[in-house]
Amino acid sequence: MDYLYKFQKLIITLSVFLHASNLGFGQDIVYPDNTNSINNSKKLAFASRTKEPPTIDGILSEDVWDIATPISDFVQDFPNNLTASTEKTEVRLLFDDYALYVGVDLFDSSPSEISERLARRDDWMAGFEGISDWFTIDFDSRYDHQTGFVFAVNASGVQMDATVFDDTDYDEEWNAVWHSEISKDMTGWHIEIEIPFSIMRYTESDSMVWGMDMARYIHRKNEHITWIARPRGVRGIASRYGKLMGFDHVPAAKQIEILPYVLSGRNSIKGEMLSYPDSLGSEFSPLDRIDRNLDGGVDIKYGIGSNSTIDLTVNPDFGWIEADPAIINLTYYETYFSEKRPFFLENSTIFDTPIEMFYSRRIGKMDSRILTAGKLSGKSQDGLSYSVLGALTSDYQSGSWASDLKNEGLSYYLASRLVQDILMGNSFVGLMFNSTGRDGHSTNDVAADQLLSIGNNRLIIDQQIALTDITGLHGLGYAGEIAYDNETFFSTYFSVDYFDDNFDNNDLGYNPRNDLTNFEVGLTFRKQEPGPICRYAFTSIDYNHQSNLDGLVIGNYVSTDFGLTFNNYWRISAGINRSFRHYDDKLTFDIETHNLGPYVKLPQTDGAYFSVQSDQTKQVQIGATIGKGKSIIGDWGEQYSIYINLRPTSAIETSMYYSRNRSFEKFHWLEITEEIINESFSDSIKLHYMFAESQNQMNILTWRVSAGLATNKSIEFYSEYFISRNHFNDQQYLELLEAKAYPVHTEYQPYSSLPDDSSLLEPYLYNEFYAKYSSLNLNLVFRWEFSPGSTFYLIYTTMKTINGKESVTISDFWNYQGGDDWSEFSTEGSLYIKLNYRFNRR
C-alpha cells in the first residue's frame, strides 16, 4: 500500500503541473524561426516524398535520388571559420510513410587519402573524433530548439547515434536501430542512410517542420565543415539548426522492441583473509568458491505515439560493463563513480540538475539484484518534457530471480521529473520528485529548478532549490549560477551553493556534504582567431570560498590557468594555485566507528602544474603532466603522468596511462582511539585523535586495446594495475589535543607490533588502513552484433588484490599466494557468454 501511495502523490503532482494554466503551461509554445547563417538569413532545406524507397547499398545510382533537391552550401567551422569548404559535399533527402532516407556524396580530390577507422559502434572517441573521415546529420524533430537526434557514419561504415539535450550537450548513450551503407570510388565516398520515423519523436501534422544541421570531417586536413555557419564562440546546438520542410501526411510511428537475453557462465574466488585483523596476523580464513550461473531477462521498448517511450527491464545484466577504477577511500566523503549501465544512461539527461538529485548508481549496489525497472519519457507538443523512472531491487542476490523477489530485503526507487519550455523554448523551469523505501525507512525529495538563456544564449541563469525528508527530518539545499559569455574574448561566472545541516539526498542522489556555504567566481579571457604562432589561447582566474554554517572557513582557494593550441595542433597548459589557511571539519572521521572528532587546522599550500599534449589527429599521440605542491609547514606532494596512444592500423588502437604520485604529510589522519582511565574506582573513557607522519605513494598503470574486426564485431581489453603505499613513522605519532589546531607529539602511545588488551596493532601492519595495497583488474569483451540490435557477448574478467604485502614487480604480485603475517589476498575471475535478440514491430 505504501508503494501505491507514493505513486498517487506523483500523479497528483503531475496533474497540478499540467493544469497550471496561470503559468502558461499546457498551451502550445510558438518557437521562433532560427537565424543561423552568417548574414542572419534562414537556412532552408526540403525533403521529397518517394513512392519507392531506395536500396540502401551506399551507391546513389538509382533514379529515385533525382527527385530530391541536393544540398551543397557547406562552410568551414574549423580551422578557417566561415570560409568555403575545400571539398564538395552534396546531400539529398527522401521520405515515405516509414522512414527518412539520406543520400550523401562526399567528394574528395584525393580519395586514396580518405581516413578509415574500424571501431565499436557508438564509440565516438575510438571511431570518429579527430581520427577518421565522417559525416553527421542532426534532426530537431520536435522543433523545440532544445533537443535533437544525431546520426553519424564514418568512412569505414561504423555507426554512431546520440541525442541533443538542453541545447548544450550530447547524450551518446541513446541507441537506435537504423540502416546505413557506404561505398568508395574515384570521386570520394558515399553514404545511404535509412532512418525509421519510429525511432524519433515528433508531433504528427499535415506539414511538419524540423530543425536540421549536417557536418563533415576531413581527417587529413583536420577540416570540419557544417551546413549551418557558426562564428567561433557562438553557443547553442539545436537552437542554431536550419529548417527542414516538405513532410506531408507522415503518420504517427509506433515502436515496439522486445530484447530478451540469456546468460551463462561461472565465477570463482580464491585467497585468504585475516580472521581477526588485530590478531598476531597468522590466523586466516580461506576463500575458495566456484559459482555457476544460468540467467535471463528481457528489455522492452514501446513507443506511445511519436512523443513518448516506455522502457521496461526485468532482471537486467550489466556484467560486460568495464569495472570501476581502483581507489582507497578512508575519508568522510563518498567516492563518486560514473554510470556505465545503458538502461540508466539512455534518456537520462533530463535528470541532470545543478544539485545531483538522481545518482543512478544508488540502484543495484554490489551484492544486490535489480529485479525490475522501468521508465516513461517523452515531450509533449506544448513543450513539457517528462520522465519517471522506477526500480525494485533485492538486497541479496541468490541464484534465483524468483526467490530474490520473495525475500524481505526489497527496496524501491522512484525518480520523476517535469521540464516546461518557456521564453519561446530557449529556457525552462522544472520540478523533480524522488522517493525511496526499504526496511521501514523512507525518503522523499522534491526540487524546483529554472534555467534562463538570455541574449542569444550569452547570459545563463541556472538555479535549483531542493527539500529532503528522511523519516520526518527536513533539509534545504540551493545551487545557483550566473554565467556570461560574450562569444568572442571573455566569459565570467558566479555560483553559490547552500546546504543546511539536515539536507540529505544521498538515498537516491549524491551530495558530498551538507552544512555548507560555497561561493565561486571566475573570469576567462581567450583568443580564438588563428595567429602566426597559435590557433587558440586562454587565461583564467578562479576563486572559491567555503564555510560551514557555524562560520568556520573550510576552503579558501585561488587559481590561475593558461593554455595554448599551436598551429601544429600541439597544446600546452599551465597553472598555479594557492589554498589559504583554513580548517577541515571532516578530516577526523573514523572509518570503523563513523564518528567525527574535532576540527583540524590546515596550512597554506601552494601548487603548480604544466602539461603538454601532441596533435590528437596523428597515429601516435603523447601527453604528459607534472604537478607539485608544498605547504608552509613542510608538507609536499608531486604528481607525474604520461599518456601514449597508438593507432598502428585502421582497426587497432592501444593506449597506456601511467601516473606516479608521491607526498609527505606532517600529520596523516589515522583513527580515534579509546583510553580507559580509572578515576576513584570508576572507569572512564578518554578519546584520542591520532595522526602520524607519513610518506605516501600511489602508482596507477592502465592499458587499453580495442580492435574493430568489422563494423559489427569488436574486441576490447582493459587493465589497471594500482599500488598504494603509506609508510608511517612509528616514532612520530601525533595527537590532536584541541580543536582548530595542528596535531602535536604527546607521550600517549597506543600502538604495538604485539597487541594485547591494552594496545593496538601498529598502523603499518593493520590491514584496515590499507598501508600496503595492490590490485590488478583485467577485462576482455568480444561483441558481435549479428543482427541489427541483437548482440553476442563473450566476457572475461579477473581481479586480484593484496593487502598488507609489498610486491616489487607485477610478476611477484601475480604469483603471490599468501602465507605472510598480516597479509591477505584474493583472486576473483569470471567467464560469461551473453546473447540477446531483438524482436521489432513497426
Label for each model-derived stretch:
Residues P231-A252, S394-N456, W570-Q619:
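Outer-membrane beta-barrel transmembrane domain signature of Gram-negative proteins
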Residues Q27-Q420, G430:
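Structural preference for beta-rich elements and adjacent junctions enriched in aromatics
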Residues K9-N22:
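Bacterial N-terminal signal peptides
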Residues S112-A119, D161-T163, Y202-E204, I321-A323, ...:
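A short, polar/proline- and glycine-enriched secondary-structure boundary/capping micro-motif
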Residues P251-D311, Y413-D469, E529-Y543, D606-K630, ...:
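Surface-exposed extracellular loop regions of Gram-negative outer-membrane beta-barrel proteins
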Residues M1-F7:
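N-terminal secretory signal peptides that target proteins for export/translocation
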Residues L287-D291, T309, F318-N544, L549-T560, ...:
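Catalytic-domain carbohydrate-binding cleft regions of carbohydrate-active enzymes
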Residues R369-L371, S377, N456, I460-R842:
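Exposed, low-structure sequence patches enriched in small/polar residues
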